[in-house]
UniProtKB/Swiss-Prot annotation:
Similarity annotation: Belongs to the BptA family.
Recorded name of the encoding gene: bptA
Protein localization: Cell outer membrane
Cellular-component GO terms for this entry: cell outer membrane
Pfam families: BPTA
Protein name from the UniProt record: Protein BptA
Major localization class: membrane
Role this protein plays: Virulence-associated protein essential for survival of the bacterium within the tick host and therefore within the natural life cycle of the spirochete.
Keywords (A to Z) from UniProt: Cell outer membrane, Membrane, Signal, Virulence
Signal peptide interval: 1-23
Tree of life domain: Bacteria
């Protein structure tokens, strides 16, 4: 009887160990939103990785697609122009959103992807469509000083600072091949927020 009890407890321990490992390895929340407007379709797929400790709370990867039959027709016919070139460059688009909580409004002056120190970084605002997006070589981190006039303020509540990093298609394809995502965010106060996690992107059809 005692032997049966022993093996029973052992099996329970093995099961619990597998369960917690499984939960840890699948710490990604997936969501898909589809919106339609007349004959146009907007699709957002989000993959959210939650951090347990520190002010860096989450990393969200976003794949966005915009389907416009008229522009798609022009794209397939290899036509050029302001709108069709922007559509070709940014459909689909790939973004990382980083959420950092603090009692202040933060700016981020630098983003470093380990292994890609020579990547071309732009710092223009996230406004589409724009000829700037057609010229995007590496990634864009936005204007780090857009909220500079608020940097000196401290608030009696938590401020959710979101940094959006837009990746070019070529840079995204390089990121997908990494085994781990090692990223450093540098704030306007020179504080570093470091990320070192398993690269979950190859697990999905992106």
């Amino acid at each position: 009887m005692s032997r049966i009890l022993f093996y029973g407890l052992l099996l329970i321990c093995v099961f619990l160990g597998f369960f917690f490992f499984f939960k840890k390895e699948n710490n990604v929340i997936y969501n898909k939103i589809i919106q339609k407007s007349e004959d146009k379709v907007f699709t957002d797929e989000t993959y959210t990785y939650l951090f347990k400790d520190g002010n860096l709370k989450e990393l969200v990867f976003i794949k966005s697609e915009f389907m416009d039959p008229k522009l798609e027709h022009k794209k397939n016919r290899n036509m050029t122009g302001y709108l069709i070139d922007a559509y070709r460059a940014m459909s689909p688009s790939y973004n990382f959103d980083f959420a950092v909580h603090d009692n202040k409004i933060l700016g981020f002056k630098s983003v470093i992807f380990e292994g890609f120190g020579d990547a071309q970084v732009s710092k223009h605002e996230n406004n589409l469509p724009s000829e700037k997006w057609q010229q995007l070589k590496g990634f864009n981190i936005g204007d780090p000083n857009i909220n500079e006039k608020f940097f000196h303020l401290k608030f009696p509540f938590t401020v959710k600072n979101t940094l959006r990093v837009t990746l070019s298609k070529g840079f995204f394809n390089k990121i997908k091949r990494l085994k781990r995502l090692k990223i450093v965010l540098v704030s306007n106060e020179d504080k570093e927020y470091k990320i070192d996690i398993e690269n979950f992107l190859p697990k999905y059809n992106l």
